Amino acid sequence: WINSKRVPEGGLDAVMLGDSECYSAISPMQLWNEYGVTSFNYAQSGQKIQETYFMLRNVFDNSQPKVVFLETNLLYRKQNRLDMVQSSLDELASYVIPGGGVRLHDTWKVMCGQAPQKTPEYKGFYLNNKVKASKYLDYMDKDKKRSAHISRTVDWYTDRIIELCKENGAELILISNPSTRNWNYTRHEVTEGFAAGKGITYIDLN
């Protein structure tokens, strides 16, 4: 919530939303240096779809980005029914009463040591020097069948995000950043079909 109110003069061309698969994958500074695109990475550790929706509402209250990138790992984040209801109520309360005794999204995670602190200089990007080359190069093998399910809650909030983007003249793009741990060909196929059914663009970088 704090970062989503930090908008550079002239506004934003693009924003990124998602979990830890996103905040070390897309650098707004690099986009600016190489393409002249102004952007901010609003991804946070363990971000849930409810957080994504209300954070995006907050972003649109302060800026009018042309493109919204949504990292797809959060589409598969597991929540039980109680968590889903609680998260939805928490995020609604945070949006209606920002800072009014309600947690400020990633801020409490940083304070508790559960998430890295990202500085404004990098526009939300977390500079991670611990990344190493993976040995599991066959993680996208088409013959390895795994289960992949998108819940009704995620489906419902995705529709709300699509509507929100349309209302604000922004294009929503689903993006899967490279991840040997969290991604596979089954998830690629399910996400591809999910995006096609919603009529939105999907980019898989795996």
Where are these regions (language model features)?
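Substrate-gating cap/lid alpha-helix
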Residues: 175-205
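Generic structural signal for well-ordered alpha-helices
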Residues: 56, 158-162, 188, 192
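N-terminal secretory targeting modules
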Residues: 1-13
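Acidic-and-aromatic substrate-binding clefts and catalytic sites of carbohydrate-active enzymes
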Residues: 46-50, 150-152, 180-187
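Secreted/periplasmic serine-hydrolase-like ester/acetyl group-modifying domain
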Residues: 81-171
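A generic structural signal for well-ordered alpha-helical segments
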Residues: 32, 165, 193-195
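Membrane-embedded segments
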Residues: 16-17, 21-99
